[in-house]
Amino acid sequence: METYVNKLHEGSTYTAAVQYNVLEKDDDPASLTIWVPMFQSSMPADLLIKELANVNILVKQISTPKGPSLRVMINSRSAVLAQMPSKFTICANVSLDERSKLAYDVTTPCEIKACSLTCLKSKNMLTTVKDLTMKTLNPTHDIIALCEFENIVTSKKVIIPTYLRSISVRNKDLNTLENITTTEFKNAITNAKIIPYSGLLLVITVTDNKGAFKYIKPQSQFIVDLGAYLEKESIYYVTTNWKHTATRFAIKPMED
């Protein structure tokens, strides 16, 4: 089994983002990706990852109003994992690598192939796209971060366009806003990292909360779901070989 710890926060209390790669224990096994709902922990990461690697995982494919889903049950006797959710449901469309091999409504034990723990800042220092979108009245433009990553093994570069938020801009203010994005946004973002969770997440650390980031606390982490980007890469490959090299910004009129 492979285990990985990504420390994006060094505080005594942190948000744990846990993802497993598992294989069903049956005659026609499906390969699955399972992510645990984020939880708060104060356990040293090295201790927590050891306990995470020694749990028993059961899965069952079910049907929900949101589509095919996986019901996950994680069993552990360790007090270290007391804060971790033990029963939850995740989207099967994202988590299944081999969906045709997964039986319906059958509870199946799984073998853990890899486990990743990412230590993020505490819950009150995390912001999502949804958090910002809800705060915008009469939006006219979208702010897009063009995050560039490089595979340090192959030197291949990937640019991931990431929606940050919508803003309301009058035409006479647009030129001024475009002029300040280069400096203001560049100063606001110090780094961006890809982490394995619900497929892949982009974690952006915001150091300055001016302008477009005024609703984000300084020094907080902004989380963006990357969906299918790089989903075929292994946990090990993404966490060790993909490095953030640059971030550019674009302001685009909202499309109907």
Swiss-Prot record:
Modified residues (Phosphothreonine): 205
Matches recorded under Gene3D superfamilies: HRSV-S2 matrix protein, N-terminal domain (2.70.20.30)
Gene Ontology BP annotations: virion assembly
GO cellular component, one term: viral envelope
Phenotype upon changing residue 170 to A: About 80% loss of host transcriptional inhibition activity
InterPro entries in the cross-refs: Matrix_Pneumo_C, MATRX_N_pneumovirus, Pneu_matrix_N
Region annotation (Interaction with M2-1) ranges: 1-110
UniProt membrane topology term: Peripheral membrane protein
UniProt modification remark: Phosphorylation is important for oligomerization.
Domain of life of the organism encoding this protein: Viruses
Subcellular location field: Virion; Host cytoplasm; Host nucleus; Host cell membrane
Reported effect, residue 205 to A: Loss of higher-order oligomer assembly
Start and end residues of each stretch annotated as Nuclear targeting and binding to host importin KPNB1: 110-183
GO molecular function terms attached to this record: structural constituent of virion
Record flagged with keyword Disulfide bond: no
Keyword tRNA-binding: no
UniProt KW keywords: Host cell membrane, Host cytoplasm, Host membrane, Host nucleus, Host-virus interaction, Membrane, Phosphoprotein, Viral matrix protein, Virion
Motif Nuclear export signal, residue range(s) on this chain: 194-206
Chief place where the protein resides: virion
Described function: Plays a crucial role in virus assembly into filaments and budding. Early in infection, localizes in the nucleus where it inhibits host cell transcription through direct binding to host chromatin. Later in infection, traffics to the cytoplasm through the action of host CRM1 to associate with inclusion bodies, the site of viral transcription and replication. During virus assembly and budding, acts as a bridge between the nucleocapsid and the lipid bilayer. Also plays a role in the inhibition of host interferon-beta response in a RACK1-dependent manner.
Family statement: Belongs to the pneumovirinae M protein family.
Subunit structure: Forms dimers. Forms higher-order oligomers. Interacts with glycoprotein G (via N-terminus). Interacts with protein M2-1; this interaction directs the matrix protein localization to cytoplasmic inclusions comprising viral proteins L, N, P, and M2-1 and mediates the matrix protein association with the nucleocapsid. Interacts with host importin KPNB1; this interaction mediates nuclear import of the matrix protein early during infection. Interacts with host AP3M1; this interaction plays an essential role in trafficking the matrix protein in host cells.
Protein known as: Matrix protein
Provenance organism: Human respiratory syncytial virus A (strain A2)
Lineage: Viruses, Riboviria, Orthornavirae, Negarnaviricota, Haploviricotina
